[in-house]
């Protein structure tokens, strides 16, 4: 089979840096899917992305589509011809659809009869005739939230397109994509290398672009260069670079030929909380901060330039000049804010709405204060500290620093509280109330902080559900999904004995008559249990395990987690499959019983040896496991229940449950009811697949 490497590049104006990697990988995935759909063989699709280009390279792409045989079955011969042997309308219509006449059709004989059939071979097209359409479709299906038009063209794309290059080996695939005719012209770096040059063969990409155009098209290569050089620069300064993946990807998306440099700022700025300085460096300037070995911020930072002059000092000084006013602003805000105590800002919260129907931030603060104290009492935290932290929880939103640098909310509250002489646990809780901020983030360290974090999240969940504004589709303006999952993580991972329904009831009571949804408790609990499902599925827990536990609707998250772990373990036992099937059988039998089913077994009505054996074990386990269930030791309980497999199997093999004698029948049903209820104290095992 003849193969060639294929290459396609779309040259654009500067693409959105936060979206570049996603666009490039989606482009490659789309191309791969289109190639497979077209039946074209290939080894691999590589993707490339730089600020002004998206590109793919298909390795060892087949030069032709394979030919394929088709078989279209028509009507049965008995229905294809009338009594005189002439084709019926059904046969003629089918033949027309196949592009043949009825007499050209073949016959297919099966054990069910004889049929008309059309067989043909469709010759595969040359790959070069297909690639223009494949690339166009792949670009059209990119995840672009907002497109733009340019010039006098009617086409739309994420940014204006200037060049399109499609090469199959050395052959140019001619045509037009996004209003631009395909050609061999590749654009280089804006300031380095050749501005434009010609590419003659797909194999020359991306090396020719780097050699002539001073552009490293390989996103991952640029990323690794920036990461390695940044770490080296930080080490040379006796520190460690703070390089987050998202910021590294964004910086990689901003440069075509990275030049990693270091700069400094005045040490006096280190008197400002490091978080505010880092927010400016990372968020505004896209710099990498440097910390010493003890985690203290150093007066240096790393930045990445897109040019590589002989003398880098003008660039370094320029970046130092740019960041200085931002750090000065942070210093000014910090010093100004310290002139007022956090508590003095409480009245200003009355001027800011949390939500029109739910009141102001001051209203929310008072609810958090009350609920945090309630939660603290339940989990053994200091109630007074939790209430104090709840009272101060939103005060930093009124400071100059947080108004200017919004991502510093919480952390600045902590620093200002320390300055005010607040208890350290209270101060730290002001920062940790927002934890976890994202998937995988740290949880609050102390129980005081956990109390405030939970109070804040439950207040938001209860309030928004209470006015009927639950998330719909992907829209979640109050981040309720994140709040729910964060609350669940805190309760489960810290093993807190808290009940969701109880917390929502207490939270709802604090809203007075503001809530209009009478079902708010059930709605919030169901929503949070739904988040549990997603969380466990992401963690690799089988869906049927989650459904088995959900069927019992346990509303204590720590208890829910213990059940899931126990059922996951039970599922691995040799007896699990048979007991799940037996539970399903028991469930079906009991579902057909009219009226109430007894839950006491009458030993005098036990006749068969197999039912006596089952009753003996079931009653023994009922007594033995009562304290085990009370402790929530569900794994031990299921391990013990697993020993019932043999006696349950023997019972169903030898005993007729629905006996004609009513007393016998009801007693056997009662025994199955006791058996099933033992399992139901953990989960509905009958739902296991």
Curated annotation (Swiss-Prot):
Organism (species): Actinobacillus succinogenes (strain ATCC 55618 / DSM 22257 / CCUG 43843 / 130Z)
Protein name as annotated: Glycine--tRNA ligase beta subunit
TM region positions: none
One term of GO molecular function: ATP binding
Gene from which this protein is expressed: glyS
Keyword Electron transport set for record: no
Gene Ontology BP annotations: arginyl-tRNA aminoacylation; glycyl-tRNA aminoacylation
Family under the similarity heading: Belongs to the class-II aminoacyl-tRNA synthetase family.
Keyword match Membrane: no
Annotated compartments: Cytoplasm
Top-level enzyme category: ligase
The protein's Enzyme Commission number: 6.1.1.14
Catalytic reaction list: tRNA(Gly) + glycine + ATP = glycyl-tRNA(Gly) + AMP + diphosphate
UniProt keyword list: Aminoacyl-tRNA synthetase, ATP-binding, Cytoplasm, Ligase, Nucleotide-binding, Protein biosynthesis
Quaternary state and interactors: Tetramer of two alpha and two beta subunits.
Gene Ontology, cellular component aspect: cytosol
